[in-house]
Regions:
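A well-structured
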Residues: 1-186
Length: 186
């Protein structure tokens, strides 16, 4: 008897006809992220060391909302690709999402760089009032010694899409074609 691998449904993330990647909600997510990032870019000029805690928390919460949608979009694309690495539509979506995430990440990079460059006293003041966000904010600051300038960080983000991520996707597409026949003895 030959085992037939069943496909999982990604409809809980983004409903699509025939399990495909043609969900209208998917396009809505791209649009929402674009809108939210454009709005988020407006806070760049408001970032300052002595900013009020409530203003800072609003910025962090806004970032969280966008990040949740981005993660959902990325998960959908990754799972669609993993389900069938030979599916051209899934490959295209995976590449589109990776490029889109790099672009959006580059546009919001300024916040992380500002946060890592903030003096310790003001960072502590803001973290002390940040509740559940404290751990996230502390972890961001741990990467301070390994952070480059904004132009350099943008180059790294773009390079990752066409560099290491592209190689991983190629490897997955090739090795997913392998078929192994097993004969169970007993």
């Amino acid at each position: 008897m030959t085992y037939k691998l069943s496909r999982w449904s990604l409809n809980d993330l983004f409903p699509a006809s025939h399990g495909g990647v043609d969900s209208p909600e998917l396009e809505t997510a791209f649009d929402q992220i674009e809108e939210q990032v454009t709005t988020f870019e407006g806070v760049r000029g408001k970032l300052r060391a002595d900013m009020p805690v409530d203003e800072f928390l609003h910025i962090v919460q806004t970032s969280e909302v966008t990040t949740r949608i981005v993660n959902k979009l990325d998960a959908f694309a990754g799972l669609a690709f993993a389900a069938d690495t030979q599916d051209q539509a899934a490959q295209t979506l995976q590449n589109r999402v990776q490029q889109f995430m790099a672009d959006m990440g580059n546009r919001t990079l300024f916040f992380g760089l500002w946060w890592k460059g903030l003096d310790d006293a003001n960072a502590k003041r803001l973290m002390d009032a940040s509740g559940d966000y404290r751990y996230y904010l502390e972890e961001m600051r741990h990467f301070k010694p390994h952070t480059l300038t904004e132009p350099e960080e943008k180059i790294v983000n773009i390079k990752d899409v066409t560099g290491s991520s592209a190689l991983v996707n190629l490897y997955d597409a090739i090795t997913n074609r392998y078929v192994f026949k097993l004969k169970v003895d007993g």
